Amino acid sequence: MHIKTLTVSQLNRYVKNTLDADFILNNASVKGEISNLKIHSSGHIYFSLKDGGSKINCVMFKSYAYNLKFALENGMDVVALGNVSVYEKEGSYQLYVKDIKREGIGDLYVAFEKLKEKLKEEGLFDDVHKKEIPKFSKKVGVITSPTGAVLKDIINVTKRRNKGIELLIYPALVQGTNASRTLIEGIKILNKVEDVDIIILARGGGSIEELWAFNNEELAYAVYNSKKPIITGVGHETDFTIVDFVSDRRAPTPSAAAEIAVFDREVLINEILNYKYNIKNSMENIIKEKRNYLNLYKQKIEANSPTNIIVNEYKNIDNLKELLNMKIEGKLNKEKNNLSRLSSLLEAHNPLNVLKKGYTLIEDEGNNLITEKEALKKLNKINIIFKDGRAKLSIEYIEEFLK
């Protein structure tokens, strides 16, 4: 019998065509519990459906996911309607879901909510019990698996932020039956190490079953009773476990937990330099301001000192003296001008000037000036005044001019 050789692509396409032609697989209704739920930024939803013995990968595209009437959650029992087909590129078959009906809440989810409510009522989640996260830790305890990416991520973050921080690793199981016990033991041991400042409890992402060790009641009490502050970084940002609610600080990822626990040395140095610069500037401004005040007060004191007052008064006296001299000089000049003007006026009206022109003056014997002939009728003698002397004359007759 001749067997035809197929390429991988041909084989996957053949299986796909076979499944797509099957009536039952094209109209499948599958009941199971949701796990590994991931909602992509594109809007597509990826998850697994499982029961006690098996699981199948599922995808629900955005166009169908848009019509969902409720939010999907890990641990939720649902009935998924769709078709089974092959993803040719990977050679894997999966359920392409078109609709989902809620069947009920899964057993793990019920147990999770029950324990969460119990511990909440007991006050284990209250903020008043949260211990303060130290800002400058020197030694950080880490409880996680010694293998895998989580520990490497924490170490890398620590080296990048501060090489001087010491990590004390407690290797623990993070999945399986004995995982909770080893996590509790790690908390107890690290609490006995005196110089451990803070503890990181970490694990990578996974399904609700894979993270179930962190939903243990005894572990929750161990976290609550820890003398050292505990940061949890369990799973991805959308994953929440019981210890996340009890811990002193919940980080969305293990790397984020390391970011919180380990202070950035460069940032601290820059902050110190900024503080130093600000203090220096503040002190310089204060000194400058006080110096200005001092100079102002000094000027006021100097201005009001007896010596300055006397000097200023002397200056005032000199100014007044100068002003007085100016006024006196001005007054004298004014009076000189007036005197000169009056002298000129007096000179202009001086009778002697008239006599120089050949005229004479007549006075009686009492030296009274005679200006009219009528006055002569009463006199016998008169004085005649010339420019260069006088003569006494006797009146013999008086002649009157015709008008």
From Swiss-Prot:
CDD domains linked to this entry: ExoVII_LU_OBF (cd04489)
Key words, A-Z: Cytoplasm, Exonuclease, Hydrolase, Nuclease
An example Gene Ontology biological process: DNA catabolic process
UniProt subcellular location: Cytoplasm
Keyword Magnesium attached: no
Enzyme class: hydrolase
Entry's EC annotation: 3.1.11.6
Alphabetized Pfam families for the sequence: Exonuc_VII_L, tRNA_anti_2
Reaction(s) catalysed (UniProt annotation): Exonucleolytic cleavage in either 5'- to 3'- or 3'- to 5'-direction to yield nucleoside 5'-phosphates
Entry keyword annotation includes DNA repair: no
GO MF assignments: exodeoxyribonuclease VII activity; nucleic acid binding
GO cellular component: cytoplasm; exodeoxyribonuclease VII complex
Chief place where the protein resides: cytoplasm
PANTHER family xref list: EXODEOXYRIBONUCLEASE 7 LARGE SUBUNIT (PTHR30008:SF0)
Chain's role: Bidirectionally degrades single-stranded DNA into large acid-insoluble oligonucleotides, which are then degraded further into small acid-soluble oligonucleotides.
Family: Belongs to the XseA family.
HAMAP family referenced in this protein's UniProt entry, alphabetically: Exonuc_7_L
Subunit (UniProt): Heterooligomer composed of large and small subunits.
NCBIfam families, per the entry: xseA
The name this protein goes by in its record: Exodeoxyribonuclease 7 large subunit
Organism of origin: Clostridium botulinum (strain Okra / Type B1)
Organism taxonomic ancestry: Bacteria, Bacillati, Bacillota, Clostridia, Eubacteriales
